[in-house]
Amino acid sequence: MIDAFFIAGTDTDVGKTVASKAVLQALAAKGLNTIGYKPVAAGSEKTEQGWRNSDALHLQKAATLEVAYEDVNPYALELPASPHIAAKHEQVEIEYDLLSEKLAQHKEQADVVLVEGAGGWRVPVSDTDSLSTWVQQEQLPVVLVVGIKLGCLSHALLTAEIIKADGLNLVGWIANRVNPGTEHYADIIEMLESRIDAPKLGEIPYIPSAKRKELGKYINVEPLLNID
């Protein structure tokens, strides 16, 4: 069984956090201790406790183990922009060593660590580097979240290709219906199933305020548990 994996998205706003919550809930239903980890988050709000990102808070709440917010989300950036822009605005350098240190800490505590990315696969974290470089460094298996909408086929297939070209193991994908009006839904799913060389872990229907709902029933985590 893998002890950590990375949740990637075909783009921003495709439902990575919704899918992450669903996976965490499904893992918890199997009796596993989990931690949700959001290394970098842009679009945070100032609170009495410090800067907080809503997606990271959802991960913190969905996990079975209690972890300090600063360990769930070491880089909570204010601007709702690409991480490299938000980091530059705050004069912050995103250090891979810190991300790795937190990941190692989480692995010691949990059976499974779910690491949620930011934006799409090649989202920059500096003028010269992307978060995917750190994922390669850690050799994290990847689960791809596909937001089902017009144009998602090309985005999904290209992202799946580049993940594998980066030398990483694509261990599954999740369909998240972000637009209830998307036509030809079944045809889109059929094409993704035939073209993505990884198991479909589930389909999450369009659900208003999905981040606040019980979603684990939509996910089959068995393929993840059977990976050495």
Swiss-Prot record:
Binding site residues for ATP: 13-18, 55, 116-119, 176-177, 205-207
Compartment list: Cytoplasm
Domain of life: Bacteria
Residues at which Mg(2+) binds: 17, 55, 116
Keyword set, alphabetical order: ATP-binding, Biotin biosynthesis, Cytoplasm, Ligase, Magnesium, Metal-binding, Nucleotide-binding
GO biological process, one term: biotin biosynthetic process
Recorded catalytic activity of this chain's protein: (7R,8S)-7,8-diammoniononanoate + CO2 + ATP = (4R,5S)-dethiobiotin + ADP + phosphate + 3 H(+)
GO-annotated cellular components: cytosol
Pfam families according to UniProt: AAA_26
Record-level Gene Ontology MF annotations: ATP binding; dethiobiotin synthase activity; magnesium ion binding
Top-level EC class as recorded in UniProt: ligase
Parts of the chain that traverse the membrane: none
Gene3D superfamilies found in the cross-reference section: P-loop containing nucleotide triphosphate hydrolases
Assigned protein family: Belongs to the dethiobiotin synthetase family.
Subunit structure: Homodimer.
Role description: Catalyzes a mechanistically unusual reaction, the ATP-dependent insertion of CO2 between the N7 and N8 nitrogen atoms of 7,8-diaminopelargonic acid (DAPA, also called 7,8-diammoniononanoate) to form a ureido ring.
NCBIfam families in alphabetical order: bioD (TIGR00347)
Protein name: ATP-dependent dethiobiotin synthetase BioD
Organism: Vibrio parahaemolyticus serotype O3:K6 (strain RIMD 2210633)
